């Protein structure tokens, strides 16, 4: 079998592109051919009132463009099972259209960012999720529009 490049991960016989949540947030608005069919992202579990009522949670990571004053918590809705608030997860999945965009409205601000933005068009269909230690640098500073992504 061919080796999997470092920009990808192999799980259960499927190949996933590694990218960060901010990159995925930006790519989700592009033509479908530009969005990875399967991906792996790293994020922190957050609870939102509307999401929780629908059996979902927010997978979130703070993106910084210039400085922490302009930080935005980028979020996607996902079924993260019983993962506790604040848990870091490596999530393997794919996108699916969000049937109720109201679920993504007004996500609670995260502890590190005063602004949260939840993707209102798509949710992550979780194929696998693994608890991981918090990253050394929890913030996203780099955004790429093609592979290899910043992960």
Regions found by a protein language model. Name each.
Residues 1-151:
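OB-fold and OB-like single-stranded nucleic-acid-recognition modules
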